[in-house]
């Protein structure tokens, strides 16, 4: 059960992992100033490190648990467990790449703006989803279009 709890990466746990409180904007503060960029850099780096630790734990777990079971049912169960873990790690590897892309945007001071329309994404949305690259309006439109294409 402990391992399952560690895998939850809600926005609140991402902030907790990074050891940061939600950002408190000051009146008249410029959007994506140095303090805000540092805040998100800390969050993204901590999230990336946590995911890398998970990948390392999985590799160690699979090496430790690898056994050649004579019983075909036991062997199949172990292979299914490993397959599920590998799919999860693959998703996490893709997320790590997205985090690294986002960190590059932070470094280039191009972070926090919608890639579609250029407006500010917003501090709260970015704390909830630090890798967001669309504002809520553009994301909603993209989801509606996606739904129409699928339906």
From Swiss-Prot:
Which Gene3D superfamilies does this one have? DksA, coiled-coil domain
Please, which domain of life does this record's source organism belong to?
A: Bacteria
Organism of this sequence = Escherichia coli (strain K12)
* Coiled-coil region(s): 33-54
List residues binding Zn(2+): 114, 117, 135, 138
Against InterPro entries, the record matches this protein to: DksA_N, DksA_RNA_pol-bd, DnaK_N, Znf_C4-type_bac, Znf_DskA_TraR, Znf_DskA_TraR_CS
The miscellaneous annotation reads:
Dosage-dependent suppressor of a dnaK deletion mutation. It suppressed not only the temperature-sensitive growth but also the filamentous phenotype of the dnaK deletion strain, while the defect of lambda growth is not suppressed.
Transmembrane feature ranges: none
Phenotype upon gene inactivation: Deletion blocks induction of rpoS by ppGpp, but does not alter relA expression, ppGpp regulation or RNA control during the stringent response. Increased expression of ectopic dksA, 2-fold decreased expression of CsrA, 10-fold decreased expression of sRNAs CsrB and CsrC.
User: What PANTHER family does the entry give?
Assistant: RNA POLYMERASE-BINDING TRANSCRIPTION FACTOR DKSA, RNA POLYMERASE-BINDING TRANSCRIPTION FACTOR DKSA-RELATED
According to its UniProt entry, the function of this protein is described as: Transcription factor that acts by binding directly to the RNA polymerase (RNAP). Required for negative regulation of rRNA expression and positive regulation of several amino acid biosynthesis promoters. Also required for regulation of fis expression. Binding to RNAP disrupts interaction of RNAP with DNA, inhibits formation of initiation complexes, and amplifies effects of ppGpp and the initiating NTP on rRNA transcription. Inhibits transcript elongation, exonucleolytic RNA cleavage and pyrophosphorolysis, and increases intrinsic termination.
Say which family it is in. Answer: Belongs to the DksA family.
Cite the residue ranges of zinc fingers (dksA C4-type).
114-138
Gene Ontology cellular component terms for the protein in this record: cytoplasm; cytosol
Cell compartments where the protein resides: Cytoplasm
Q: Provide the protein name.
A: RNA polymerase-binding transcription factor DksA
Instruction: Outline the inducing conditions.
Output: Expression levels are constant during exponential and stationary phase (at protein level). Negatively regulates its own transcription, translationally activated by CsrA.
Q: Which HAMAP family match?
A: DksA (MF_00926)
Query: Quaternary state and partners of this protein?
Result: Interacts directly with the RNA polymerase.
């Amino acid at each position: 059960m402990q391992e399952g709890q560690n895998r939850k990466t809600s926005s609140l746990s991402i902030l907790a992992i990074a050891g940061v409180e939600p950002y408190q904007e000051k009146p008249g503060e410029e959007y994506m100033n140095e303090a805000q960029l540092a805040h998100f850099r800390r969050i993204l780096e901590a999230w990336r490190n946590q995911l890398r630790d998970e990948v390392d734990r999985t590799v160690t777990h699979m090496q430790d648990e690898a056994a050649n079971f004579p019983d075909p049912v036991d062997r199949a169960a172990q292979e299914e467990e490993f397959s599920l873990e590998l799919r999860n790690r693959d998703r996490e590897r893709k997320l790590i790449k997205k985090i690294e892309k986002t960190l590059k945007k932070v470094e280039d001071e191009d972070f926090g703006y919608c890639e579609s329309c250029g407006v500010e994404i917003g501090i709260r949305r970015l704390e909830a989803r630090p890798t967001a690259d669309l504002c809520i309006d553009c994301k909603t439109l993209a989801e509606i279009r996606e739904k129409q294409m699928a339906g």
